[in-house]
Every structure is written in C-alpha cells, then in structure tokens.
Amino acid sequence: SLKNNVNVLQMDLDKGLNSFESNSFDYVVLAQSLQVVKKPKDLINEMLRVGKEIIVSFPNMGHWSSRIQLLFKGMMPITTNLPYRWDNTPNIHLCTIKDFLKFCRDNNFEITEQCITNKKQKSSLLTKIIPNLFGEIATFRIK
C-alpha cells in the first residue's frame, strides 16, 4: 500500500491494461481474481504484454470439498475460497487446476513454476501428488 511505498491502482481489468506501456513491469500479479474477469485469455495476453512474467492465482474448483458438496448436496459448492451462492457470486469462470493447465497449453502460455496449496497457503505431500484433488489455491508463474 501507499504507506509502504507500493503504488496501488484500482481499475476494471475487463477493459484491459491499455494505460500501461509494453514491458513496463518485471511482474504483473493477478491474485485470486481470474475467475471474475469476463475474458481470461485477453487479460493474460495483456498482462504478458505489460510484464516480463506474470503470476496468476485462483481458487481450485476441483478440490475434494467442492466435489463432495456437488455429489451429495447436488448444489454448487460454497467453500472458504468460493464463499458465494451461485446466484450472487462475482465468479463467472470457475476452473480446476487441470482446466487451467489445458487453457495455458491451448493458448501457448508457458508455465515456468506452479505452487498448489491449501487455504492456509501451505503445500503438502497430497497437494504435490494429486494437486487437482487436494489443492485449494493454485498459483502459476507464466511467461
């Protein structure tokens, strides 16, 4: 924030990043917001234009708790990371880790690093072995 000498901007990401010149940042970060933008592919392309690398994180809809809720309740899951009911959520593009990996492959986005964690931002053996089932938060470095 400003008191820590960090510039903070608030803007509509769906309108793009036109106010920034190409390659004006080393990193561009999209934290826990991918699921709320209208055109994720366009935004990631814009982020890659503006920054040398980007960091994207999102809640994993493939986590076992979401699957259990859908299976047994037959309703869209409500979790710590996705706390809204389907009818009042800002989320419009929920995805799993596997969905995002395929999305990156299909769009030639090169993932250079990934970190899959639980809601406390801790990695475990299970999040490493079966990330799509046990990871709650996915973070990717892309160039």
Where are these regions (language model features)?
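Conserved SAM-binding strand-loop segment of SAM-dependent methyltransferases
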Residues: N4-F20
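Short, hinge-like loop/turn segments at secondary-structure boundaries
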Residues: N5-L9, D26-V29, L71-M75, I130-N132
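Short beta->alpha connector loops
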Residues: D14-K15, L34-K39, K120-K122
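Alpha-helix C-terminal capping/helix-to-coil transition sites in glycosyltransferase folds
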Residues: N23-S24, V50
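S-adenosyl-L-methionine-dependent methyltransferase catalytic module, highlighting the catalytic core
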Residues: K41-E46, E53-K143
